[in-house]
Regions:
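Glycine-rich phosphate-binding active-site loops on the catalytic face of alpha/beta enzymes
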Residues: 83, 94-112, 167-170, 198-202, ...
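Charged helix-capping and loop-helix junction motifs
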Residues: 60-67, 141-150, 175-184
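Catalytic cores of alpha/beta
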Residues: 73, 77-98, 180-216
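Conserved beta-strand positions in the central sheet of alpha/beta enzyme cores
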Residues: 48-51, 78, 101-102, 125, ...
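Conserved anion-binding
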Residues: 11-12, 19-23, 90, 97-171
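Glycine-rich, proline-tolerant flexible connector loops at the mouths of alpha/beta enzymes
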Residues: 46-64, 104, 165-175
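Conserved, mostly hydrophobic/aromatic
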Residues: 8, 39, 47, 92, ...
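Glycine/small-residue-rich loop that forms an oxyanion/phosphate-binding "nest" at active or ligand-binding sites
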Residues: 53, 61-118
Length: 239
């Protein structure tokens, strides 16, 4: 199982939100590259980057920070947040970003998403964020009428091979993750590499996720608060 430490960007700063709430934001650093280097020194080979300004407003205000992270080297980098056009995908891939994550647009424009999956293959992942089991969009501000598991099936049928699934209720809450959900996804949507995201706060959870065949896990607040030690986690579960 691969581990993706997370860097969430707001106004160029490293931050974490609680349950996707922009009013419940904690700033953990002013320098994303310095934070990424700390992750590398702990043994990380992957990095999950979210442009929170992009997710909320569609802006490119964190573009320089993302460019600097991509230029740093030594990490497989996936980026999400506000990617709603092919132009934005090309922009990030040309920087050296390894994979772009489509979020809200996968719900609002499924045909576009299917085309991008066909055109770019494994360089596209889809982020599915669910609130009470239903897909949430636009920075988690709106909830759709479609169940997350059903949406994952549709994505798989469209050729999606990688889905980052977040249960919003668990995200940033430091109360554990929804293991039953990831077990269900592995069983009901075979053939998709799922990344678990939201609330992972113990080594036991990581081991359980690996055991059930989860492809990757994103670690956020648990690293910033010191609840988990990245070096030990990498040694424990990373391929």
């Amino acid at each position: 199982m691969n581990l993706f430490p997370a860097i969430d960007l707001r106004d160029g700063k490293v931050v974490r939100l609680t349950q996707g709430d922009y009013d419940r934001m904690t700033v953990y650093g002013e320098d994303p590259c310095a934070q990424a280097w700390q992750f590398v020194e702990a043994g990380a080979r992957y990095l999950h980057v979210v442009d929170l300004d992009g997710a909320k407003d569609g802006t490119l205000s964190n573009y320089r920070s993302i460019a600097a992270l991509a230029k740093q080297g030594g990490l497989y980098i996936e980026v999400g947040g506000g990617i709603r056009t092919e132009e934005r995908i090309e922009k990030y891939l040309s920087l050296g970003v390894d994979r772009c994550i489509l979020g809200s647009v996968a719900v609002t424009d499924f045909d576009f998403t299917a085309r991008m999956l066909k055109r770019y293959g494994e360089r596209i992942a889809v982020g599915v964020d669910a609130k009470d089991g239903f897909v949430a969009i636009h920075g988690w501000k709106e909830v759709s009428a479609e169940k997350g598991v059903d949406f994952c099936r549709r994505l798989a049928d469209a050729g999606c091979t990688a889905i980052i699934y977040t249960d919003i209720a668990y995200d940033g809450a430091m109360q554990g993750t929804n293991l039953a959900l990831y077990r269900q996804l592995a069983t009901e949507v075979p053939g998709v590499a799922f990344t678990a995201s939201g609330g992972i706060s113990s080594e036991a959870e990581l081991l359980e996720l690996k055991k059930m065949g989860t492809a990757a896990a994103i670690l956020g607040k648990s690293l910033y608060t010191g609840a988990l030690d990245l070096k030990r986690c990498v040694e424990l579960v990373q391929n």
